[in-house]
Amino acid sequence: MTPKLILASSSPFRRMLMENAGLFFEAHPAEIDERAVEAPLEKAGAKPDTVACVLAKAKAEDVSARFPESLVIGSDQTMSLGDRVFHKPKDIADAANHLRALSGTTHRLNSAIVLVRDGAVLWEHVGHAELTMRPLTEDFIARHLSRVGERALSSVGAYQLEGEGVQLFEKIEGDYFTILGLPMLPLLGKLRELGTIDG
């Protein structure tokens, strides 16, 4: 039987958010080269929220091709500081560089969701959050990264707000779910509107 609702992601955090909301779904990660999709957009000067939306759409369309009758949720998150777009750090040294760049500044998270069925886009949404990181010393960055280890490599910005990363911040504006990479309230509203979940 074809699943009714599919999350096109391997992210344990996105799966957890959907499970905690009581949604019945399957998770099937997209098989796309994200950097190959993203590179021409960045070269053309696309805004970070546009990049997030295009990546979310590419993921959903890829999975929809395998499960055409299912409603597929594609999602992606980009992070920017001024004109600089951040990606997941490659290693701990790169994570330290991210934290140095973000220290004492306000950056933006852009979390996109796209719903696709039978290859057709039914809905797109991009949520935004502004996060102000407190000034961090070199010693603190080193101690923090020694505690969190490779978990720092699993998200843009080298932090996880749902864990010890919350200690890095002095101010946050925006929806918590958007920060975690899946704006749940707009998503749940659209799923109710489509009759996918009980409303």
Swiss-Prot record:
<feature type="active site" description="Proton acceptor">
    <location>
        <position position="76"/>
    </location>
</feature>
<dbReference type="GO" id="GO:0005737">
    <property type="term" value="C:cytoplasm"/>
</dbReference>
<comment type="similarity">
    <text>Belongs to the Maf family. YceF subfamily.</text>
</comment>
<feature type="site" description="Important for substrate specificity">
    <location>
        <position position="13"/>
    </location>
</feature>
<keyword id="KW-0963">Cytoplasm</keyword>
<feature type="site" description="Important for substrate specificity">
    <location>
        <position position="162"/>
    </location>
</feature>
<comment type="function">
    <text>Nucleoside triphosphate pyrophosphatase that hydrolyzes 7-methyl-GTP (m(7)GTP). May have a dual role in cell division arrest and in preventing the incorporation of modified nucleotides into cellular nucleic acids.</text>
</comment>
<keyword id="KW-0546">Nucleotide metabolism</keyword>
<keyword id="KW-0378">Hydrolase</keyword>
<dbReference type="GO" id="GO:0047429">
    <property type="term" value="F:nucleoside triphosphate diphosphatase activity"/>
</dbReference>
<dbReference type="InterPro" id="IPR029001">
    <property type="entry name" value="ITPase-like_fam"/>
</dbReference>
<dbReference type="InterPro" id="IPR003697">
    <property type="entry name" value="Maf-like"/>
</dbReference>
<dbReference type="GO" id="GO:0009117">
    <property type="term" value="P:nucleotide metabolic process"/>
</dbReference>
<dbReference type="Pfam" id="PF02545">
    <property type="entry name" value="Maf"/>
</dbReference>
<protein>
    <recommendedName>
        <fullName>7-methyl-GTP pyrophosphatase</fullName>
        <ecNumber>3.6.1.-</ecNumber>
    </recommendedName>
</protein>
<feature type="site" description="Important for substrate specificity">
    <location>
        <position position="77"/>
    </location>
</feature>
